[in-house]
């Protein structure tokens, strides 16, 4: 008897999850929160394009592990701001993992109302310490009044634009962590036309051609 496509898909996702958690181990409680988040995302994906459909079979390694690896680069950070959170990567994933860190809080900034609604539901369902801001990025970072330890972004904009978004927060002591792809060197070269930065590059733990750009000092060129 042939397996149905649903059964095959379920086995593929289960294998991908196992591979992801081997790369980026989490507590049982965090795993349960992530399971609820993934179930919700798959439900909403049918009506709202939250991630590229082609990446769904590898959701755990492609998106969740990719997000979780940021935690090792800011192990003491409690207050995070995720710019352009979209489907919740890395923001919701980080919030799920940080739920066990006293005082932790992840601010999810999203300008599209439908995606912001999804993010709110994801935070509700998982019980993760997240706050959703329906806002343009520039509006909220310029008015930010609280402390920030880390600012993140993934699949949002070219690096030189991300640096501009993050500048007000980095100047106040935040560390910027940007998930980028194979064109990272070209993006860094372009960024130096506008900004004085001393970035650190980390190869993505998930393999492929992914990179993490870490920046803790930003100055504009005169």
Swiss-Prot record:
One of its GO terms (cellular component) is cytosol. GO terms for molecular function: rRNA (guanine-N7-)-methyltransferase activity. It is found in: Cytoplasm. It catalyses: guanosine(527) in 16S rRNA + S-adenosyl-L-methionine = N(7)-methylguanosine(527) in 16S rRNA + S-adenosyl-L-homocysteine. It is an enzyme of class 2 (transferase). Its EC number is 2.1.1.170. Its main location: cytoplasm. Keywords: Cytoplasm, Methyltransferase, rRNA processing, S-adenosyl-L-methionine, Transferase. S-adenosyl-L-methionine binds at residues 84, 89, 141-142, 154. Specifically methylates the N7 position of guanine in position 527 of 16S rRNA. PANTHER family: S-ADENOSYL-L-METHIONINE-DEPENDENT METHYLTRANSFERASES SUPERFAMILY PROTEIN (PTHR31760:SF0). NCBIfam families: rsmG_gidB. Belongs to the methyltransferase superfamily. RNA methyltransferase RsmG family. This is Ribosomal RNA small subunit methyltransferase G. It comes from Bradyrhizobium sp. (strain BTAi1 / ATCC BAA-1182). The gene is rsmG.
